């Protein structure tokens, strides 16, 4: 998208840090967010040390979590934070009054509907949302929690156990939460600003102090005769994540601003450079845009870990895992050799939410419906829909290519390495092509971008996918005919044997 004119930024949040914003030349809402997250990090350490389950009961822990979370929301978003509180209140009323058989439907419609109305108002009423505080992030996290909890209550109270999948059975909630539990789950200071989202049962186990035992029992510590487990320290995990956060911040300030995504649709840049160099810049600019997401999600993960939330048992080497609610795996994203591998490691908790409320429950067209829900949840910028609609055929084509050709490259290590290099390069190119409209936001620059790229991935999918589908169909027909011929031959030889058997009798 073209660079926005220099217009003073308006915020509904606190202006106490405005001098710091001017000094750093960083928008005030971003300064408020960063300072509040750093405050939350310190508060989380204090919460873990002085309000641990051994020192304070669940009620006290719930109250402190909720009150600090509300204060942070008001500081960052001012009166816009009312939208968060209204959605939580509305959906709590629905949860308490709705019939169990419909609780998930009503909650889903109410939460997604309210989120969508707020996003429409930001984009189309308040000047594309670029000159006002963005409160949609926390609202998106709250929407995930509201809808996932509603489905989990429906699973636990309205469905038979044998009708549930393994994950649904594990996460099913057998009683409606109290008002305090509900508010604490949605408004706690560990995750109100940047999430990540978490499952209700995991959060309640953390508040009540059962989360360590549950995870270590899952890792079979009972086999060693343990009945009580030590409280693992998150310091190492938090330190590692803060180092990553700082590196991402350095990358963002030093690299990202020098490779703006909007340059991909600059008329002069398009006219003066070849397709190859435009493709190279596309890859560089998209990769340069990732650290801001890495920064926000890794910092959010560190905040939760500092409070003691996020412990996920032990790995195969016996090391502590603090990735229960981690939202990304940077190494796996950057080295992904398939579109699926990247999706599985990017915005992980949102992917789990989409699977829980849509993909695993949709009777038909689960992939398309999941992408549509993802686009709707992200917002109403046209670029989001270009991204997710484009992702559908590319995903289907990638699956078809993998199923048709991967087995040819598994016969030797050299071929496998060659296959991995080719699939890594093609995956990164495809991802850059897919996500650029997401970053450009608007329709006009998106169409200009597609034209500058000659719609090459769209055309490639349109040509390759039908051919591979026909090839698969022909192979299935060939195998079916081969099996039928084999069956007929065996039957032909069986007749004389049967007749000979009758004569011998």
Regions found by a protein language model. Name each.
Residues 1-505:
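Non-catalytic, membrane-anchoring transmembrane segments at the edges
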